[in-house]
């Protein structure tokens, strides 16, 4: 099965159905790639056509008996971390790899998946030469390598020219997640200095592997799957189904389906696909918080966006990670509140039991909270490390001053000792020299210990 073509076609049909179901008028507006730099950015802070700078206002589809409420997302004036996003397979261009034009399908998915993260971070999203819906993603091939190298070029540009030592979160979905995973494996995981700034990754739908029952040791040597609320430096990844994935499911299993990494396909007897539950790792109770932009359901709105196009649907879906028959997946079910007649947003765009297409937006609210918790934990740790470093460096300065004074005292006493004539005076001076040398040795050991602690903390400080 050509996963790229199949997923892309299902996505287009499903979105058309969903748009019709809610009677949302939309049409396609042309867009061209900007020029003048090595990277074409579809989202970049301060850029005139930054697609992630649009409205994030909206309200809920409330549960039965409750009133609609504003979603309440706002943008921080100076977010402490960045997000780097790679979009999923969307290009409908004829060749195996897309050019860098900002085509409507790409603009639509960038708004749907990435824009809301601007409530947590500065979002950078490069255009890249992704494998198109007409390309082949069944295995690693030339087209996949072209796409990855293009995405990698954007990431290197971001690190070199925009990161400025800040913490960063990697975001992706499907093909975008697979390229994010390779960026982690080949760049982040291998560079301790970069791992210090790695706040986390959100990369659903890409079959990232770990040893069965473990958090680390598969595709990545150092970066683990997230397992605790507020944990940073880890990966959120999952594949969503509402039933046991079949033996030929493209996601959730390693013996079949999506695998476009240079590494050999792992042995499913020893390894499994990561499943991290976003509805628990956000500190919640297992219920999803979907977020959907209704202006961009079908395409790019011809008349521009409305003021408040986002809709949430709390307490409609519940999820849990499950293992069965070689699959490891995020199992979706309905909460089933009495009298709940709200639209089943996920089923409208799913492919049977496979919820790959909507799995980011179905958990968008949870993912935003996870990103915020990771950012908060990272910043708190960095602030604590910086404060501790300041304290230790002050102690080091005091220690050096004490040692210098002690040495002066020893030199002065030694000179006196050389000139002393009486035995009693010489013995007293010797005792004082010996005592000061002991104190100097203690101070030197304290300085050595302080330097070691400072070095350890500096290695943890971004």
Per-range role (PLM):
Residues 385-462:
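Extended amphipathic alpha-helical heptad-repeat regions
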Residues 172-176, 180:
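Gly/Ala-rich beta-loop-alpha elbow adjacent to hydrolase catalytic centers
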């Amino acid at each position: 099965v050509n996963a790229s073509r199949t997923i892309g076609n299902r996505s287009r049909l499903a979105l058309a159905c969903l748009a019709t179901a809610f009677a949302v008028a939309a049409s396609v507006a042309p867009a061209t790639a900007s020029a003048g730099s090595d990277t074409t950015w579809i989202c970049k802070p301060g850029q005139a056509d930054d697609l992630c700078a649009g409205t994030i206002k909206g309200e809920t589809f409330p549960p039965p008996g409750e009133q609609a409420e504003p979603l309440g997302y706002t943008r921080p004036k100076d977010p402490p971390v960045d997000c780097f996003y790679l979009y999923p397979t969307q290009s409908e261009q004829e060749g195996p790899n897309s050019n860098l034009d900002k085509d409507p399908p790409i603009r639509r998915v960038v708004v749907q998946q990435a824009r809301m993260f601007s409530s947590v971070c500065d979002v950078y999203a490069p255009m890249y030469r992704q494998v198109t819906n007409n390309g082949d993603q069944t295995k690693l091939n030339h087209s996949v390598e072209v796409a990855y190298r293009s995405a990698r070029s954007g990431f290197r540009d971001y690190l070199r020219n925009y990161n400025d030592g800040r913490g960063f979160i990697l975001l992706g979905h499907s093909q975008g997640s697979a390229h994010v995973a390779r960026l982690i494996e080949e760049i982040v995981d291998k560079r301790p200095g970069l791992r210090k700034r790695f706040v986390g990754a959100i990369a659903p739908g890409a079959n990232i592997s770990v040893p069965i029952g473990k958090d680390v040791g598969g595709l990545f040597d150092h970066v683990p799957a997230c397992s605790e609320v507020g944990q940073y430096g880890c990966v959120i990844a999952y594949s969503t189904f509402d039933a046991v994935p079949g033996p030929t499911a493209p996601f959730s299993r390693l013996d079949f389906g999506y695998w476009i990494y240079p590494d050999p396909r792992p042995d499913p007897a020893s390894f499994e696909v990561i499943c991290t539950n976003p509805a628990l790792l956000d500190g919640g109770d297992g219920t999803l918080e979907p977020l959907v932009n209704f202006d961009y359901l079908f395409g790019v709105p011809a008349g521009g966006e409305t003021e408040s196009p986002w809709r949430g649907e709390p307490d409609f879906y519940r999820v849990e990670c499950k293992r069965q028959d070689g699959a490891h997946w995020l199992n979706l079910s309905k909460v089933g509140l009495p009298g709940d007649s709200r639209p089943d947003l996920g089923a409208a765009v799913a492919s049977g039991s496979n919820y790959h297409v909507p799995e980011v937006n179905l958990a968008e609210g949870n993912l935003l909270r996870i990103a915020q918790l990771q950012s908060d934990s990272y910043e708190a740790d960095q602030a604590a490390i910086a404060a501790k470093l300041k304290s230790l460096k002050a102690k080091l300065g005091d220690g050096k001053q004490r040692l210098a004074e002690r040495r002066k005292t020893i030199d002065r006493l030694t000179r006196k000792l050389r000139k002393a004539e009486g035995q009693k005076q010489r013995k007293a001076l010797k005792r004082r020299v010996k005592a000061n040398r002991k104190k100097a040795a203690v101070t030197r050991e304290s300085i050595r210990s302080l330097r070691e602690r400072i070095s350890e903390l500096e290695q943890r400080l971004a």
